[in-house]
Amino acid sequence: MANPITCDEILFERHPMLSSLARFCVRRRRIVVFGIWIPLFFIVAVVSGAMKGDFRTDFVLPSSESREVQELLEKANPNKAGFSATVVFKGDAVLNTPGLKDAMASFLNQVGAIDGVDTMSPYDNPQQVSQSGNIAFARLDISNRSQAEGITFSDEVQEIGVATLTNVSGVQVEYGGEIFVKFTVPESEALGILAAIVILVLAFGSVLAMGLPIGTALLGLGIAVSTVTILSHATLMPDFTTSMVAMVGLGVGIDYALFIVTRYREGLQAGMSVEKAVVDAVDTSGRAVLFAGVTVIISLLGLYVMGLSFVRGLATGAAIGVLVMMLASVTLLPALLGMVKHRIDVTTRAAIAALIVLVLSALAAIIFHSLPVLLLGLVGAVAITALSFVFRSLRTPIPVRVTKARELTFWFRWSRFVQRRPWTALISSASVLVLLSIPLFSIRLGFGDTGNQPEETTVRQAYDLLAEGFGPGVNGPLFVTVQGDTAASPEKLMAFAGALSQAENVAFATPSPLSATGPSTEIDGQPLALVVVYPKSSPQEKETSQLVHTLRDDIIPATGITAKVGGFTAASVDFADYIGGRLPYLIGAVLILSFLLLMAVF
């Protein structure tokens, strides 16, 4: 009777296409590296740098009350349908500070002259002054802008502030709102790369064996991020897409390259030639890389079933990142392996010393936010490398670590343990998975706000000052659109705002003019007005979500007035409800597509 074919034999079956591709990459390694990948990197980097990104975070549901509010405000006054921002002032009896009134008037006049901006001064609205009188805020309503336009606007407003407000002594000025958030390179990704470098060097005992996966992933990441930046002009992508690409791309890029490098080193240790070892690595581990990559891409594209435009853009960007990493792993990496040949296991004293200097300087640069420290480390690493050409001792190879026989390794013995006691392994692992899944049943979905920013940033300080003076809810106002006779009557509108102010968890509510001529405007033949409601709880608290539902389901219907609750905070509540309802469809789509892929492969 013939022996059955195992899954390993199917997965690692020799594939003529992969074999031919690997052989081409080894034999034409200079063309692959210097004629394809590196030029591609510079081309997309230059193009993306010239075009800039056109990322737009369009948090609009297909059908929701917050969407209806958004559409009404866009018709009435597009500035009210975009970003809400604040300029916060703190000082003793701040509005009585000599010179502040004139300086603030000059500031708001110049900011209000910018296209698509409405301003409201605390001198015109007492509710924008804290009870202590020490904190006040000016409100800015800004029309929707792309990420690049938002950065330009933020810089322009703060430049106006420097010119008009800094001469007023005794007053602290901070700028709050998402539009003033400055993009910084996430420290987590940089720390992750440093951790990967240290772990891989310890695991492989070789700088080159570590450097190839890291280098391949970084080059692929640069191409992926630049490509996504270019594509943001063709399809809607949120402004955090590049962070998602970096997070997913680095993870899979290093992982996929590790598969192939490990198999290549095993081939060399088995006595294969360089070309044969590369071909064998791509034939086996490369096939696993393609299978794993396609599975991840399918899972990401499963996000399309959510039916949200910004989620589709996010999924597309992350899928592009994974695709680039897959291609780099089976083309660029084999070419690099063909270049280093047997030197992949050779590490000199100079290489280790240069790596230590570089890692420590990079860590210090991240901790102290100092680019000169990183540059100093780079200079030190280059100097050590240069000195190795003068001092022979620096070129001395570090003894190669003795590799244990396969049967003596921990993972070999672990696999045998699992095979001998399958039920023990199954029950134990299933129990751990169940325990880890318990928090899922109490998860609350939503969006972060500027309260999550670092404490030293102006947006976080503005957030904290507003929370100190008015309560945390002032950082997440609710926009209530009012239609009908109430909108046309200032007295009735004030009475309605007063009724909303009496609701539990409402700090205060105030009408907000929709036009320069008065508090209301006419849309489709019907008066429309806006009331801004400030909760007592912060935007991310459960009580704020409950307030949105209470206003919609109980308080507003009881008044008999036609009004709808929207704004960013209400939209985040709608998103949480919508996404929670769509999660089963997402999970089902991913499982079905993955099952079909497994059926096709096996």
Per-range role (PLM):
Residues 1-53, 117, 143-445, 559-563, ...:
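Membrane-embedded transmembrane helical bundles of large multi-pass transporters/channels
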